[in-house]
């Protein structure tokens, strides 16, 4: 059995994804500052009190160093939807490490240890916020509200992202999915028995009975687009809905019906039923867009 394999491409990092997103800029800045406070205070506390110092705090600092870098890279490369599950798992581990470090440092009446504990408390607070953000669906009201403050930024992916993750399979060609159903008529010459006995139908057992209904002979009617199956979809004239793009999308160059759009771009939508919506951009360009990349306003 053959399966269609999705195409993967490396997304280029852009510092604008951090600067243009107030939430990402604020949380990463606070986390970095808290880590620096804990790092410096931990070294000072270890030098002043080397005997009873909890060395466990060093492992927490190393773990959070990689965790903050990972969050920065994921947000900068606009790959949140791809790695959000892994991020939530690592953030959960980091929350355990930071709270344990606070418990080991805050009870001593020593300035350096208390400063280190304060830094770990800030890290714990940022971690809780990150878990809520990355663990929520993009359509969740709190996350959609936070994302609404981010500037529009387009992801520059070298390969087109497939739709297998959202619906479990590839989308059929849209050029043949809108053809009207073909109509067929059959001529009835008499009453027929679907279960003949002895190979004889009801019409043969009593030939004197005239047929109850005889339909006029008709011909098979072909669909209007049967001669040209690759015809493009005719766009509608009314677009009563408005939707906001929660991810960037690059149209398939082999399908003329799809349109590309950037993250946070506003689109007009004519119909919200189905997996693909007929949409129109502000520039007037029309086409179909994946519904799981959009959120209604």
Swiss-Prot record:
Residues in SH3 domain copies: 238-297
Chief location of this protein within or outside the cell: membrane
InterPro entries: SH3-like_dom_sf, SH3_domain, Sho1_SH3
Topology feature Extracellular, residues: 45-54, 103-114
This protein's record includes keyword Membrane: yes
Subcellular location: Cell membrane
Cytoplasmic compartment segments: 1-23, 76-81, 136-297
Membrane topology annotation: Multi-pass membrane protein
One GO term describing the cellular component: plasma membrane
Subunit structure and binding partners: Forms homooligomers.
Family of this protein: Belongs to the SHO1 family.
Annotated function: Plasma membrane osmosensor that activates the high osmolarity glycerol (HOG) MAPK signaling pathway in response to high osmolarity.
Protein name per its UniProtKB record: High osmolarity signaling protein SHO1
Gene: SHO1
